[in-house]
UniProtKB/Swiss-Prot annotation:
It is found in: Cytoplasm; Spore wall; Spore polar tube. Interacts with SWP7. Involved in adherence of spores to the host cell surface and in infection efficiency. One of its GO terms (cellular component) is polar tube. Transmembrane segments: none annotated. Residues 1-29 form the signal peptide. One of its GO terms (biological process) is cell adhesion. Keywords: Cell adhesion, Cytoplasm, Signal. This is Spore wall protein 9.
Length: 367
């Protein structure tokens, strides 16, 4: 009796097994290679802005906008002084900031461990957040054509929106009475506005080159962070970390602390520009679209506006690309981080509006 069919079947099975093993190894090797390239590979600094914008628009910005806090059972995790303090502010009593005010909250870690990234400086920003939400609550949003009106029982009239009609007095009230000992976000508002205006008007004086920031820009950032309330001892470490903050974002590989700091400044940027009349025409309204969804989309637009201002710190603009790339350049590009900017919409018009709004608001907050 012939055994040829059995041999053929056995050979096919071995070939299939080897193909499966090889394809599995390749599937594992590619992401590992990309991670190693990400960690240790050299990325052209001229590509930082492009990589940064790709990272923000295609993934990172959504985490700042879609995050919502849910109460954590007090006995579910070991207690500590830091966790107890966080819980008392975030979720306990009538003034539970993260529960009573459904404003977006960015979680670089799981919500259960969010407290490890919070300190008194971050808690101070929440005071402005409360003022903003209370303002929304007392000043209902007008209907937007084609959108569903929010329910009357809503605790807050939708978690975010621009309000060009806010009075100067109401705008100032968002920031007053939130700082202690002359330190905090409100006290640092004018400094932050100056930094944003410098990035918009004089980006050549704010550049990151060869791993270092322009000396004056570095000092301006140190002064801003100090004004937020960090101690002299803290500032020694923070000052050294500031250039790395921008470098890691240029590589799309920030630490959880970097990401948390970025989102705090983004929220602060939103609060400071709440009275701007921005262009949200890129947000497509659909039948039955709820107001909260529309506002979420406008928040994404503002995230892109903020990111494009932030990206001015880098040597080249975000639409820079390496011309006449050689074979090895293409290999490095394949295994490196994404630089796909197809979803990035130019925000020059809105950045010009930011400039006008901040000049006005600087004067208001300086009085």
């Amino acid at each position: 009796m012939s055994t040829q069919p059995t041999k053929t079947s056995s050979t096919k099975l071995r070939i299939f097994k080897w193909l499966f093993i090889i394809s599995t190894l390749v599937a594992i090797a590619i992401p590992i290679t990309r991670l190693l390239m990400h960690l240790y590979g050299k990325i052209d600094e001229k590509m930082y802005a492009r990589i940064f914008m790709s990272y923000r628009v295609n993934s990172a910005d959504s985490f700042m906008i879609n995050g919502r806090y849910k109460a954590i059972k007090a006995k579910a995790y070991p207690t500590s002084e830091e966790r107890n303090k966080f819980n008392s502010i975030a979720q306990e009593g009538d003034k539970a900031v993260l529960l009573k005010y459904p404003y977006p909250e960015h979680f670089s870690l799981e919500p259960e461990w969010h407290y490890t990234l919070c300190d008194d400086v971050f808690y101070n920003l929440w005071k402005i957040r409360v003022n903003v939400c209370e303002y929304y609550k007392n000043n209902k949003q007008e209907d937007i054509a084609g959108l569903v009106t929010p329910p009357k029982e809503a605790k807050v009239d939708r978690f975010f929106r621009q309000d060009p009609k806010i009075s100067d007095d109401d705008y100032k009230k968002l920031f007053t009475g939130t700082d202690e000992n002359g330190k905090g976000w409100s006290s640092a508002a004018v400094q932050f506005i100056d930094i944003l205006l410098n990035l918009i008007n004089k980006p050549e004086e704010c550049k990151l080159k060869d791993g270092k920031l322009n000396e004056k820009f570095q000092k301006d950032l140190e002064s801003l962070v100090s004004q937020l309330g960090y101690s002299t001892e803290d500032m020694k470490n923070i000052a050294n970390e500031i250039p790395n903050f921008f470098i890691q974002f240029g590589k799309a590989f920030p630490t959880v602390i970097h990401s948390t700091v970025y989102s705090r400044f983004y929220y602060f940027f939103l609060f400071l520009t709440i009275n701007g009349n921005f262009d949200f025409s890129e947000v497509e309204k659909t039948d039955g679209m709820k107001i909260e969804e529309f506002n979420k989309q406008t928040m994404k637009v503002m995230a892109s506006v903020f990111a494009q201002i932030f990206a001015k710190v880098y040597e080249e603009s975000y639409n820079y690309e390496i011309k006449d790339a050689g074979f090895m350049d293409k290999v490095r590009a394949y295994f490196s981080v994404s630089d796909n900017i197809d979803n990035v919409k130019d925000q020059t018009k809105n950045i010009n509006t930011v400039k006008e709004v901040l000049i006005k608001n600087k004067e208001l907050l300086s009085k």
